[in-house]
Structure formats: C-alpha cells, structure tokens
C-alpha cells in the first residue's frame, strides 16, 4: 500500500498515480500539507523541527514521511517538500531545492535534489522523481 504527503508538488504526484488504472488497490491516500500548520496537525511534524531546520529540509521531509506512513500503516510512503520558486525562501535556500523522503516498512531515505526551471517545471520534475523513488522501492522489494 502507498501513502503520499505533498508540499511543493501540491497534489501533482498523487494525480500522476491516480492517472494509472488499478492504482485504487494500492493507493491509500494522498494529502497536501502546504502550510507548516498542516504539516504539524496532519503529519505530526514537530514545531521544533520546523523552527530549527525550516519546512524545506531533510529533517522535515523525514518527519513528513513518517507521519503519512503512520496514518494508515502504509508499506510505502513518499513525502515531498521544496522550493518551486520563483523566489528562494527566507533562509536563502535556492529555488529548485527539493527533498523527497521515502519510507518502506520502517526504512526511511531522504534524497536532496536540485531542479532547474520555472515553478511548473520544478513541481513536475519533483513529482516524476518521487514516482521514480516509488518504482525503485517496488523493484528492489518484489
């Protein structure tokens, strides 16, 4: 089973999965947690993590994926957070910086990726990369 928590991708990743016939047998949920408040309330991201590292960080991505996996006891979970632009965030992290966290039966990995392009392109590239991460988990474990 698969669960997804999206910030910068804003539902695009879930939409890409739902485009595929038969996904209903695997996809449990996809939620968009764009604000810090929703990351805390829906996913259990710690306020201290957001204050110390910011919403766009490896630590936040890790807590997001842990939270979404725990909600419905998913086998596979993915979380995305990043800066789609057009401006960098208040801490100066660059446009295109993306963290994609994956969870598989308790194992968590976080990939830091930088994409070039406009807001639309960065969001699409991040979604495609997250799909690729799901694909790699499935191939490795089947």
List PLM regions with ranges.
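Short alpha-helical segments enriched in small residues
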Residues: 1-142
